[in-house]
Amino acid sequence: EESLRPLIDRIRTSLDHTAFTYEVVFVDDGSTDGSAAVLEELHASGSNIKVIQFRRNFGKAAAYTAGFAEADGNIIITMDADLQDDPAEIPALVAKLEEGFDLVSGWKQKRHDPLGKTVPSKFFNWVTGRVSGIDIHDFNCGLKAYRSDVTRDVKIYGELHRYIPVLANLEGYRVSEIPVQHHARQFGSTKYGWGRLFKGFLDLLTVMYLGRYMGRPLHLFGALGLVLGGLGLLINGYIATLWLRTG
């Protein structure tokens, strides 16, 4: 809750002097502190501030989905509310979109995170880049810019929010990145670590497997049918042999 007022102040400082018209959509993912009251206060302070409140914690993918559905703009920016992402980067993200890209991810420079987060995160990003073939360095950066077509077409659930660049690329959208500033966490603590890393790799395999066969379902089920059919023939042959031997 401590970061919410400074965050909206930084957003206003970064955007009020630009030609952009904008709104801010906060998604409260079932917070148990005083965030809900602060968000209601912020909502009352400006007509361009919207608030979505979940009754319990549904996770980041659900929060993104709700925020995307509520947003009215042609360009959507996502960022975490812990003040590690810098709203001053928004104009640069939008400028990169205007070069012809559909999704632009931030690439955090000089990260201010403990080794328990940066080491698994770097490993995760390296593996994801190699497996997906997408040449970006920071898939899990919360600071991203999207054309609204991307947020409308890419469906996420579970933990798939970290793979939005991969999913967008599979849909034919152009993905890029720019370096962004990263600030030290002032409030709260990180929950990222090796446990989430392992789960993330399982999700990556799911994304790539489905992406490979999404347009060719018969290739998947045809091959699966051949394997199962072959196993069935072997089992039936074994049973028939036993029956003949025992009479």
Give names to the regions the model predicted.
Residues 1-15:
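Short, well-formed alpha-helical segments that are part of the catalytic scaffolds
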Residues 2-5, 33-42:
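Acidic helix N-cap motif at the loop->helix transition within catalytic regions
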Residues 12, 20-31, 52-53:
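Short beta-strand/loop segment that forms part of the nucleotide-sugar
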Residues 15-20, 43-48:
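Short helix-capping segments at alpha-helix termini
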Residues 28-37, 83-84:
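A conserved acidic beta->alpha catalytic loop
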Residues 41, 48-70, 75, 84-170, ...:
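Acceptor/aglycone-binding surface of glycosyltransferases and processive sugar-polymer synthases
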Residues 163-247:
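Hydrophobic helical membrane-anchoring modules
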